[in-house]
Structures are given as structure tokens and as C-alpha cells.
């Protein structure tokens, strides 16, 4: 999201499903827009810190790490950056699968909401290489599906083939 404050352009980055848009708006964007004078990372921390956990962003790796952990990253005109924690809360509780028994690992099950499911995957795979490709399947139901892969690990040709086959599905509902 790009915002203007006191003639300065500020960019706010976040990952959909991992941050609360209302908290982002109320506790980060609004205080930044109400600032007196030019903004940088240090002043932004002072303005926002009473509402959200914040820290300076040191480099691109730090920014990516913050993004995949439920923070928003704010970039200022001079190249300065800060991150603020605005994690989202769950909608319907993610519970243990009723049909599948697991011995090791997470005991989470997907819900009906694709956004909740993709954020669940992101919480377990906190790598910037995780790729989520969204598509719509079904002529009438227009069901959102997400193809997940990890760049550098997943066979790219296989991902393209699955994506193509999803796009070719001709069905009323899914």
C-alpha cells in the first residue's frame, strides 16, 4: 500500500492473511499519516510503538523475515525502514484433523476459508521461497484454489503442469 503523509510517499508492505488489516490501519497507517513533519524509521517507531511492537529493519533479509512472521514493513523516502507486529487473529479455530491421525508434526487441519489456510501454511513454512498461486475454478461456484510450492525445491515444470491442469478444469462447482 502506498500512502502520502506531509508530501512524503511511504510504502507499507504486508502479507495478506498474516496481518490484521484493521490493526494495520488503526495502529500503523493512521499514526504515520498524523505525523508532524518528515518521517523516518526512528520517528515512526516513536509514533507507533505504543500500539504495536516495532523495530528498525536493517536489510532486505530482515524485512522478508519480518513479513513472513506477521509484521508489516514500512519503507520511507530516504530508504529507512521499520517493521510493526500486526498479526491477525484466527477466525474459526484451526483444530486437529478428525479423520487423519498424525504421530509427529503439527496437528492442524484446514478450514473452509482459503485465506486462513494459506496463512496456516505460511506460519509453518516461514520461508520467502514459498510461492502461492491463486486461481479460480468452477463456472458457477468460482472457487478460489491456491497452488503452493517452494522455489528452488519444487520442480518448476511440475508446478506449471499442475497450474495448467487447474486452469483447464471445466466444471460448474468445486
Language-model region placement:
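Membrane-embedded alpha-helical signal segments
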Residues: 1-174
